Regions:
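Hydrophobic core of alpha-helical transmembrane segments in multi-pass integral membrane proteins
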Residues: 4-16, 160-167
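Small-residue-rich segments of transmembrane alpha-helices in multi-pass membrane proteins
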Residues: 36-37, 65-66, 113-122, 192-194
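Hydrophobic alpha-helical transmembrane segments of polytopic membrane proteins
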Residues: 43-44, 85-93, 165, 236-246
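Transmembrane helix-bundle core of multi-pass membrane transporters
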Residues: 103, 107-174, 200-203, 222-231
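Hydrophobic alpha-helical transmembrane segments
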Residues: 3-4, 30, 37-38, 59-63, ...
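Helix-loop-helix "hairpin" substructures at the membrane interface of multi-pass membrane proteins
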Residues: 77-85, 91-96, 149-226
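Single transmembrane alpha-helix segments in multi-pass membrane proteins
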Residues: 8-74, 98-105, 243-246
Length: 246
C-alpha cells in the first residue's frame, strides 16, 4: 500500500506541478544523490539481518572520502582513490566487527563509540577544511562511477542496482547468507549447527565498512569536493530505508 500511496502522490504532484515534476533535471538530481543512501541501506540490511547494528557508517563514509580526496589530489588517479576509500572502510568495519564479535562489546555501543572517534579524527586531520576535487572530474574512472550515461543518467544509480542484485544473491543464494540469517535469528542454535557466528558478525561489519567507503568515494566524485561533515544527516534516512522500506 505504501507503493500505491507513493504513486498516487506522484501523480497528484505531476498534475499540479507539471513544470517541476515532469522535468528530467529533478529526477536526475534524485538519481545522483539517493544512491548514496541506497548503498548504505544495502550494507546495513546485512548487518541487521545478522542481529547487529552499525551506527558508525556516517563517520566511515567521511574518513574514506577524506582518503579518496587526498589520494586523488596527490596522485591524480581516481581509481587509486576509490581503492583507498574502500580499504579504509573495510579497515574501520573490521575494527567494529572485532569489537563486537571477539571482544563482546554490544554492536550499538561499539559503533557509537567508533563513530565519535572517527568523526573527531577526520576533523582533526583535515583541520575542518574542505577539499576541492574539480580536477578529477574528467577521468575515465569518474565517468564510469559517477558520470552520466548518455549524458543524462547518473552512473551511480546503475551501480546501486548492481550492488542490490549482488547482495541479494549473497543473502539468499549463498551459504554466507544462510550463516548471516541464522546468526541473526538465533545465534546459539546457529553455533550448534556449526556456523561460525563470530566470523559472520565480523563479516557483515567489515562489508558494511567497505560499502560505506565506496559510497564516500562516489559522494566526493558527485559533489566535486570533500567536506568534513560528509555523512552527517545520513543515519536517519538510511535507518528509515532499512526498517520502514524493508
Amino acid at each position: 500500500w505504501l507503493t500505491g500511496l507513493f504513486l498516487a502522490l506522484l501523480a497528484l504532484f505531476m498534475m499540479t506541478g507539471a513544470r517541476a515534476f515532469l522535468a528530467w533535471p529533478m529526477y536526475e538530481s534524485l538519481l545522483s544523490t539517493l544512491p548514496l543512501y541506497g548503498f548504505l541501506a544495502l550494507g546495513l540490511t546485512l548487518v541487521v539481518a545478522a542481529g547487529e547494528m552499525d551506527l558508525c557508517f556516517p563517520s566511515t563514509l567521511a574518513v574514506a572520502g577524506f582518503g579518496f580526496a587526498l589520494t586523488g589530489i596527490h596522485t591524480g588517479q581516481v581509481w587509486l582513490g576509490v581503492i583507498v576509500a574502500i580499504l579504509i572502510g573495510l579497515g574501520i568495519g573490521l575494527c567494529n566487527g572485532f569489537l563486537v564479535a571477539y571482544v563482546g562489546v554490544p554492536s550499538i555501543i561499539a559503533t557509537i563509540g567508533t563513530q565519535f572517534f572517527w568523526r573527531g579524527a577526520v576533523m582533526l586531520l583535515s583541520q575542518g577544511l574542505a577539499l576541492g576535487l574539480a580536477d578529477l572530474g574528467g577521468s575515465p574512472m569518474h565517468s564510469v562511477l559517477a558520470g552520466r550515461l548518455g549524458g543524462f543518467l547518473p552512473m551511480q544509480s546503475l551501480w546501486l542496482i548492481v550492488m542490490a542484485l549482488a547482495l541479494w544473491l549473497l543473502l539468499n543464494r549463498h551459504p554466507l547468507g544462510d550463516a548471516i540469517r541464522f546468526t541473526g535469528e538465533q545465534a546459539d542454535i546457529a553455533s550448534r549447527l556449526g556456523i561460525n557466528v563470530p566470523a559472520a558478525r565480523l563479516g557483515v561489519h567489515t562489508l558494511m565498512g567497505g560499502i560505506a567507503g565506496f559510497a564516500g568515494a562516489i559522494g566526493c566524485m558527485e559533489m566535486g569536493s570533500w567536506w568534513p561533515t560528509q555523512g552527517d544527516g545520513y543515519m536517519l534516512l538510511v535507518f528509515a530505508a532499512v526498517f520502514i522500506g524493508g
